[in-house]
Regions:
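ABC transporter nucleotide-binding domains
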Residues: 1-162
Length: 162
């Protein structure tokens, strides 16, 4: 990543004491207060919480997708040793989908009901890698298994509503 100093640590994701607020005409809304996450390569994290607890805001901030009027007001975010706040849009474009992704909790609103789950996952894999259909299929099955989806081969052929 151009112009971004790489930190020496063994974490792929290293969020330390993140504080993020949204500055609205009505005042400051504190969305995240002292969030810390440390993940090594190969680890999988599921963030679970009540609606409005900051799950999406945390993920978006790591991927450089915090929408205005959101602003990081404290803490440090590193991905693969790189300081997220100093990354460019070009850096994020290379990272998103290939190195880090979000799977939203409601597949009925996140996946297209016209296409199988497998086709949609494979499309993202092929978009961000040089994998052919066979390799993309194998990787998609592996990812479904990795996150605890039972019978991943069967799920690949199903539609989101099934």
């Amino acid at each position: 990543m151009e112009g971004v100093v790489k930190m020496d640590n063994n974490y792929l994701v290293d969020i330390q004491h993140e504080r993020l607020s949204f500055f609205t005409p009505a005042g400051e809304v504190k969305a995240l207060n002292d969030v810390s996450i440390h993940l090594k390569e190969g680890e999988v994290l599921g963030i679970v919480g009540e609606s409005g607890s900051g799950k999406s805001v945390t993920a978006y901030s790591l991927m450089g997708l915090t929408a205005y009027p959101g602003k990081l007001i404290g803490g440090e975010l590193h991905f693969n040793g790189h300081e997220v706040e100093k990354m460019t849009e070009k850096d994020f474009s290379k990272m998103r989908g290939k190195e880090v992704s979000i799977i939203f909790q409601d597949p009925l609103t996140s996946l297209n009901p016209v296409y199988t789950i497998g086709n949609q996952i494979m499309e993202v894999i092929r978009l961000h890698t040089d994998a052919d259909k066979k390799k993309a299929y194998a990787r998609a099955v592996e990812l479904l298994s990795l996150v605890g989806i039972n019978e991943p081969e069967k799920r690949m052929k199903q539609y989101p509503h099934e």
